[in-house]
Amino acid sequence: MSTIAKDQTQINEKIRAKELRLIGQDGEQIGVKSKREALEMAERVDLDLVVVAPNAKPPVARIMDYGKYKFEQQKKEKEMKKKQKVINVKELRLSPTIEEHDFQTKLKNGRKFLSKGDKCKVSIRFRGRAITHKEIGQRVLEKFADECKDIATVEQKPKMEGRQMFIMLAPINEK
């Protein structure tokens, strides 16, 4: 059972390979050297020997400042996280017999979610015998989608799932 963390970079004495393809501090390729020779070269210039491609044959190692390298990696990771946008799905529950004022309140909430960039799942739960009038629920969902068409697109048309009917709305991207 391996207990190596995903960020366990092989540096200096922790390098397991006997031979390494060595790259100098300014990026020039030095060639294939033994681990001992490579470590001596790194120590001469007061830098670390870091394996950058452990799966290559032989592994590729570079003479560099490990602290600086680690900092750059963390910086890149942070930038990648910033670029990722987490899309939340907000759900609004309606009933097929919803009154106009209640509908407008739910619509206002839905528009708020969509304007923030979240997807919106609008669902209608049919209770008892109301399931026999699915067309009423479908009209309510279509009305909701129609009221939001200026800020959202229908990602999934009204669909029945058990005793629920739902529609998915996604915000329109302004790029």
UniProtKB/Swiss-Prot annotation:
Cell compartments where the protein resides: Cytoplasm
Family: Belongs to the IF-3 family.
Native species: Staphylococcus epidermidis (strain ATCC 35984 / DSM 28319 / BCRC 17069 / CCUG 31568 / BM 3577 / RP62A)
PANTHER family to which the protein is assigned, alphabetical: TRANSLATION INITIATION FACTOR IF-3 (PTHR10938), TRANSLATION INITIATION FACTOR IF-3, MITOCHONDRIAL (PTHR10938:SF0)
Name this protein carries in UniProt: Translation initiation factor IF-3
Quaternary structure (record): Monomer.
Major subcellular site: cytoplasm
HAMAP family: IF_3
Record Pfam families: IF3_C, IF3_N
Xref: SUPFAM superfamilies: Translation initiation factor IF3, C-terminal domain, Translation initiation factor IF3, N-terminal domain
GO MF: ribosome binding; translation initiation factor activity
Signal peptide span: none
Keyword annotations from UniProtKB, A to Z: Cytoplasm, Initiation factor, Protein biosynthesis
Role according to the record: IF-3 binds to the 30S ribosomal subunit and shifts the equilibrium between 70S ribosomes and their 50S and 30S subunits in favor of the free subunits, thus enhancing the availability of 30S subunits on which protein synthesis initiation begins.
GO biological process: ribosome disassembly
Gene3D superfamilies: Translation initiation factor 3 (IF-3), C-terminal domain, Translation initiation factor 3 (IF-3), N-terminal domain
Sequence intervals crossing the membrane: none
Gene that this polypeptide is encoded by: infC
One CC-aspect GO term: membrane
